[in-house]
């Protein structure tokens, strides 16, 4: 079984949007052991959509067409697929009534926007795929030796339709005889190449497929097994994960979807009944925003400080003027004074500070990417850590500083 993903949209061709749909769908297919070696991008022109379908038909059995199902003039995908396959479009009357009800609930008259009826059409002979978060129907159609799947383009509609409406069909038709098991692992603070070299040296079972994905704030590693009995697969995966976690103890932060350095730090603070605060200079509040993106962060975080200027560090945190004058703001001494200052001012257990040079220019003779982290934990000596992140963008330096700061606190507390 081989699949092809055709993504429709002039915005994709022009580079105006990132095609996250194809990536998500390819990952779902991989978990079903469905190979998808081809991905095609095409604009909204019906002739080119049909040409892409003809090419896909020659090399794939399962063909996905994503995007172009809306109510506007350039949403032509369903009609183009129907024309190519010689299938008429049929109106799902019940679904059209649902669309009208939703439009009226938004104070939009269906008579004012009659083009919305396009979203209730599907291919004759196919199975409509409901849209849990939008209006346009998808379709699942078997046509001889080929299966065609038409899906919406907006990611907030695409993913729920794949998860709730499409996957049951794929599992029923193509999942038989295939068993795929995998685990998603998360790492912070380790370069991808070095991490993968170390994992390769662990002597893991040769049936395990280990792949890595670089994200802005972490490295994700997926460990996968194909066509193995469930009990054996579970045992092999757990053994491998335990070995990896021991090897990379300082950098491994957890497994599964939704895991992040921030979520793990919040969970650890909750477990220990501790509260944290922050004092940020170059990161400008990014640490506190990242922490507060985790549900339940209010249990471990009351507030903090953004002290960009030296005067703010002195006035709000109590950093001695002499410390700044003698050592500068980009220094071990200032980072430690900021950490202890915020921890004491807020009366909490942990204070984490960030001071440094985001770039692009040098500061106080320090090159861009020089960052000091300070960590003050009640009852312990204040500590600090130097980061060197040369040749990176301002945003990368800020993001990486936050991740490394959270990792510093996490490892110190666990």
Swiss-Prot record:
InterPro entries membership: CinA, CinA-like_C, CinA_C, CinA_KH, Competence-induced_CinA, MoaB/Mog-like_dom_sf, MoaB/Mog_dom
Domain of life: Bacteria
Pfam families with a match to the protein in the record: CinA, CinA_KH, MoCF_biosynth
Similarity comment text for this entry: Belongs to the CinA family.
The protein's name: Putative competence-damage inducible protein
Organism: Limosilactobacillus fermentum (strain NBRC 3956 / LMG 18251)
Gene that specifies this protein: cinA
């Amino acid at each position: 079984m081989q699949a092809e993903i055709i993504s429709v949209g002039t915005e994709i061709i022009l580079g105006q949007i990132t095609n996250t749909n194809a990536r998500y769908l390819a990952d779902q297919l991989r978990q079903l052991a469905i190979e998808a070696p081809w991905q095609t991008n095409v604009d909204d022109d019906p002739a080119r959509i049909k040409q892409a379908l003809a090419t896909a038909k020659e090399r794939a059995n399962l063909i996905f067409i994503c995007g172009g199902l809306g109510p506007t003039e350039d949403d032509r995908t369903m009609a183009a697929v129907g024309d190519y396959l010689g299938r008429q479009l049929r109106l799902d009357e019940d679904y059209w009534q649902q669309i009208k009800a939703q439009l009226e609930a938004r104070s939009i008259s269906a008579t004012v926007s009659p083009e919305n009826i396009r979203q209730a059409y599907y291919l004759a002979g196919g199975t409509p795929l409901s849209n849990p978060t939008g209006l346009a129907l998808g379709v699942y159609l078997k046509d001889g030796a080929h299966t065609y799947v038409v899906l919406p383009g907006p990611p907030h509609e695409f993913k729920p339709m794949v998860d709730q409406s499409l996957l049951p069909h794929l599992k029923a038709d193509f999942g038989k005889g295939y068993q795929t098991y995998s685990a998603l692992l998360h790492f912070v603070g380790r370069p991808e190449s070095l991490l993968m070299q170390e994992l390769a040296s662990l002597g893991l079972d040769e049936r395990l497929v280990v792949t890595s994905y670089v994200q802005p704030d972490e490295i994700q590693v997926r460990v996968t097994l194909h066509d193995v009995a469930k009990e054996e697969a579970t045992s092999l995966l757990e053994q491998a994960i335990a070995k990896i976690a021991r090897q990379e103890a300082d950098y491994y932060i957890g497994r599964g979807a939704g895991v992040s350095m921030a979520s793990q730090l919040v969970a650890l603070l909750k477990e220990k009944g501790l509260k944290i605060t922050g004092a940020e200079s170059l990161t400008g509040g990014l640490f506190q925003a990242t922490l507060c993106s985790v549900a339940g962060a209010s249990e471990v975080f009351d507030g903090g400080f953004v002290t960009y200027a030296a005067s703010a560090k002195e006035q709000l945190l109590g950093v001695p003027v002499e410390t700044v004058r003698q050592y500068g703001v980009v220094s071990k001494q200032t980072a430690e004074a900021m950490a202890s200052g915020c921890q004491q001012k807020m009366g909490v257990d942990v204070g984490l500070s960030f001071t440094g040079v985001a770039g692009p220019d040098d500061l106080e003779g320090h090159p861009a990417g020089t960052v000091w982290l300070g960590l003050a934990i009640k009852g312990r000596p204040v500590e600090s850590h130097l980061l060197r992140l040369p040749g990176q963008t301002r945003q990368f330096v800020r993001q990486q500083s936050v991740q490394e700061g959270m990792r510093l606190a996490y490892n110190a507390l666990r």
